[in-house]
């Protein structure tokens, strides 16, 4: 039986939310926790005070260590905001211009790219760079690339995805290049700049880079919720290498310090360059900081995540409040943020739904294989099946428990959703083979191999099955 953990940290000096909002927030967050959709911390502050600060679940589900308000969470790509602030500071100091290209300030390529890529391109994902996470050498040996220089050594070998300035594509690599520019212009490492220019001035003492071999004090571990409801740590298998593109750790209260500085003082940036930052480096927008804050629809939302982690910092300038949600469960923050905003604005919002994988797993168990195969479209009408990996993972959860018929049912549905993906037939072939149905196993392995002639597993299984037939 799962124990419900609600560690309620509201101090007497905090003004109290309207009772209606408080009750709705509590119900939403309690339900999300019970449904394994959320574990972490939620902070809500108006322009003057923190009004709601509450933690849920465990920082380590294996050791049952509870989340606290000062537990550090991986904030993923929210780290890009810190890089943007550092770049804005250098522009403010007249060490850099948005129109500067790499050839002028940071020669990186030897193939003509340097003349085409500007600072603004890098900031706005329009430089044509891709994602270093997709580079095989980084994926295999992430700890070899802790320094910006080391990362750039593999990034610069990658071809551009498009001509700079002609399109946009989310790019972690672009922000590593920005980190390299920061290091060159200041003569200090990115982390030194982060500490000296942002973290220390704002006394963000619970924020910074944490590596796998770092001493971890009051630091959460990321977890994914498996289709069967078990929780699996991503700590050992995920490359936690913080960079200028993201991956730093922070707390909700530390992020609020950043928020307060951006909205209320000039410790980090003067008003002119805060406008530049908050308008996403669109220098064509001409307005004062006061005019920007007076816009009723203005706000800034940034999010970050990776398997086992999710974070949202949502600054609602027009409504004069800030919401910060940090989670050490997949998608936990993004599931909640729109619903929290709806409660605070007294708007309707959709009810929470069980995680897609959990829902399908439970439906197959509850309704049985035949019913699921006959009615899967109705059951899944409220869910998006975006990629074959989801159903594949559910199928293997059943297969690993010896529930072969259930696995086959899920794999069959996967071939219906993704008939052009060779791996769906490979998995179905494996399930039939384990059941002892060699004919259907062979049929599906052959189909998989025809679609993907490089599938060595299917090739090997076909040989095995044909030998058995003979």
Predicted regions and their residues:
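Active-site helix/loop module of the DD-peptidase/beta-lactamase fold
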Residues: 20-23, 74-78, 92-134, 157, ...
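Helix-start (N-cap) detector for alpha-helical repeat units in TPR-like alpha-solenoids
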Residues: 81, 388, 404, 422-423, ...
């Amino acid at each position: 039986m799962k124990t419900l953990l609600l560690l309620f940290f509201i101090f007497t000096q905090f003004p109290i939310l309207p009772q209606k909002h408080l009750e709705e927030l509590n119900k939403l967050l309690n339900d999300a926790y019970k449904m394994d959709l959320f574990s972490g911390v939620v902070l809500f502050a108006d322009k003057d005070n923190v009004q709601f600060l509450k933690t849920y679940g465990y920082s380590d589900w294996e050791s049952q260590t509870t989340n606290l308000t000062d537990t550090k969470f991986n904030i993923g790509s929210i780290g890009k905001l810190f890089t943007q602030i550092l770049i804005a500071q250098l522009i403010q100091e007249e060490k850099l211009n948005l129109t500067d290209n790499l050839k002028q300030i940071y020669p990186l390529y030897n193939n003509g790219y340097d003349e085409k890529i500007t600072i603004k391109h890098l900031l706005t994902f329009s430089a044509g760079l891709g994602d270093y996470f997709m580079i095989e050498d980084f994926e295999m040996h992430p700890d070899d690339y802790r320094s910006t220089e080391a990362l750039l050594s593999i990034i610069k070998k990658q071809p551009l995805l498009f001509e700079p300035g002609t399109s946009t594509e989310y790019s972690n690599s672009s922000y590593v290049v920005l980190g390299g520019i920061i290091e060159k212009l200041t003569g200090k490492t990115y982390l030194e700049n982060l500490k000296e220019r942002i973290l220390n001035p704002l006394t963000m003492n619970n924020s910074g880079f944490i590596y796998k071999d770092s001493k971890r004090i009051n630091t959460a571990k990321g977890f994914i919720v498996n289709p069967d409801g078990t929780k699996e740590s991503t700590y050992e298998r995920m490359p936690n290498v913080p960079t200028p593109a993201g991956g730093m750790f922070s707390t909700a209260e530390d992020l609020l310090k950043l928020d307060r500085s951006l909205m209320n003082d000039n410790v980090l940036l003067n008003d002119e360059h805060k406008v530049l930052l908050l308008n996403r480096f669109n220098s064509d927008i001409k307005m004062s900081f006061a005019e920007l804050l007076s816009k009723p629809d203005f706000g800034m939302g940034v999010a970050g995540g990776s398997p086992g982690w999710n974070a949202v910092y949502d600054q609602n300038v027009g409504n004069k409040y800030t919401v910060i949600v940090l989670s050490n469960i997949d998608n936990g923050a993004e599931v909640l943020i729109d619903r929290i905003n709806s409660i605070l604005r007294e708007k309707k919002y959709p009810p929470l739904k069980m995680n897609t994988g959990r829902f399908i797993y439970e439906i197959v168990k509850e309704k049985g294989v035949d019913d699921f195969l006959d009615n899967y479209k109705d059951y899944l009408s409220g869910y998006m099946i975006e990629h074959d990996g989801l159903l594949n993972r559910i199928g293997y959860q059943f297969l690993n428990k010896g529930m072969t018929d259930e696995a086959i049912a899920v794999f069959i549905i996967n071939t219906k959703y993704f008939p052009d993906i060779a791996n769906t037939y490979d998995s179905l072939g494996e399930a039939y083979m384990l059941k002892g149905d060699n004919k259907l196993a062979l049929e599906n392995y052959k189909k998989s191999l025809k679609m993907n002639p490089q599938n060595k597993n299917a090739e090997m299984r076909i040989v095995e099955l044909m030998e058995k037939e003979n």
